[in-house]
Regions:
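A short helix-loop-beta-strand connector motif used in the catalytic cores of GNAT acetyltransferases and
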Residues: 53-65
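Short helix-loop boundary/capping segments at the starts of domains
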Residues: 31-34, 57
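Acyl-donor (CoA/ACP) binding surface of acyl/acetyltransferases
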Residues: 1-24, 28-31, 63, 69-188
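Conserved GNAT-fold acetyl-CoA-binding loop/helix
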Residues: 33-52
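A generic secondary-structure signal
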Residues: 51-54, 111
Length: 188
């Protein structure tokens, strides 16, 4: 689906992915280090463009590109499988600094909680992916099981984030982002 507005933060903003983003997002998806724990893709830039066109039509599926304040695409974020009161968060690739990547995650979660009005968000991370697992704990997600995704060799930790836990943890993280932004200015 396409969300018609930009979602603006202090260091980044999100906008719905468009077919013209195919080349840059294809390159991101082909970066072996960044997608080590994700489903591997095959195909071409044209295949990525077709995927984006189909994704835009898919009910309850939002895919965003992350932009810095110079309009550079520095990542991707997804909110998908939106149901009555829940959604999933993932499809995350980040090339920004730690503050930009964290704020991009928060903006996606804000979108799910505040715009889509879900009460909980499901997410997962490879057990070996300590950085993502650490971030999930920082935002208040709670593990509920471990298991495997079809076609991926790594064990995964499956977590759920409630609106209540997120609101408590979000304030602390935003204070850090604000302090960074005030100290170093906007990332240009």
């Amino acid at each position: 689906m396409v969300y018609p507005k930009e979602i603006k933060g202090l260091t980044v903003r999100l906008r719905s992915i468009m077919p013209e983003d195919a080349e840059i997002t294809y390159k991101m998806r082909m970066d072996r280090e960044k997608v080590k724990y994700m489903h591997q893709i095959k195909g071409t830039v044209e295949d990525q463009k077709n995927y984006i066109i189909q994704q835009q039509k898919k009910e309850g599926d939002y895919l965003f590109v992350v932009l810095d304040h110079n309009d550079n695409v520095i990542g991707m974020r997804g909110i998908y499988n939106v149901k009555e009161n829940s959604a999933e968060s993932g499809r995350t690739i980040g090339y920004g600094d730690a503050f930009q990547n964290m704020e991009a995650l928060l903006l996606g979660l804000d979108f799910a909680f505040d715009i889509l009005k879900v009460d909980k968000i499901y997410m997962d991370a490879a057990t070996d992916n300590q950085s993502v697992r650490g971030i999930q704990m920082q935002i208040g997600a709670q593990e509920y099981k471990r298991g495997f995704h079809e076609g991926i060799e790594y064990e995964y930790v499956f977590s759920v984030l409630s609106r209540e836990n997120y609101q408590i943890c979000r304030e602390k993280i935003m204070r850090l982002i604000e302090r960074h932004t005030n100290r170093f200015g906007r990332k240009e």
